Amino acid sequence: VYDSSVYLMQRDRDTDDIYISYSTPKTPSRTFVYNLKTKEKKLVKEQLIPSGHNSNEYIVERLECEGHDGRIIPITITRKKTTKLDGNSNLLLYGYGSYGNSMWPSFSSIRLSLINRDIIWATAHIRGGMERGMKWWKEGKLLNKKNTFQDYISCAKFLIDKKYTSKKKIIGMGGSAGGLLMGAVVNEKPDLFLGMIMAVPFVDSLTTNLDHSLPLTIGEFDEFGNAKENKDHFKYIYSYAPYNNIKKMDYPNILI
């Protein structure tokens, strides 16, 4: 897992020029033209931040924590240099961990608004993504899906132990399959978080998986399994599906 994102945007076959986009969590997107023959590069476009932005005021860190089964999970941290690491800072922990989608480090003006208010932004590169290759994905899908949830919990506990934040000062955030992650985690560790942000969350995952008439269900079999035709898949999905595992207990604040 790297601390920047670089994309080849375009190559004109009639010239030696290629266009490259570059950004980091603290550096707005920049587009360069690079000449393959002369090895020269030129900045041709830069993302404008109307309120102003100085990348030197921020820190991007790559941390690693040990998961429940010994696997090492990367975490990307973006924060202001002046934010204190004494356990009193608010922290937003973002997670997804499905379909082999990797959460690459890139710039976001939306995140910047929070970071400028001394909120630490953390991204957990948990299994189910492919930040560490195909095996990283396979270890977070089908009958290994709970690794995704446990990895996220391990990241939250690690950040608390290292004084980046503390219990009741940490917010979880994820959307769609990341909303499934938030739902499963909050059912297991409700006392660990101040709140959860679930964007279009996939929380009634068992009912959805059982209904093959829905347009997206069959396409989900490779990721989550086929609960209708496989008893092991049914039992496993039932054991973590957020809607089926709601308990009579105090939950943190939840925004859907």
Label each PLM-derived region with a short phrase.
Residues D14, P25-K26, D69-I72, G179:
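Short flexible coil/turn linkers enriched for glycine and charged/polar residues
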Residues Y2-S21, E61, S108-L112, I246:
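Conserved beta-propeller blade repeats
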Residues K26-V33:
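Structural motif
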Residues K37-T38, K45-I171, G175-S176, L210-D211:
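Cap/lid segment of the alpha/beta-hydrolase catalytic domain
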Residues I126-I256:
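Active-site-proximal cap/loop segments of hydrolase catalytic domains
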Residues V1-L8, L48-N54:
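Conserved blade-ending motifs and adjacent loop-strand segments that build the rim/top face
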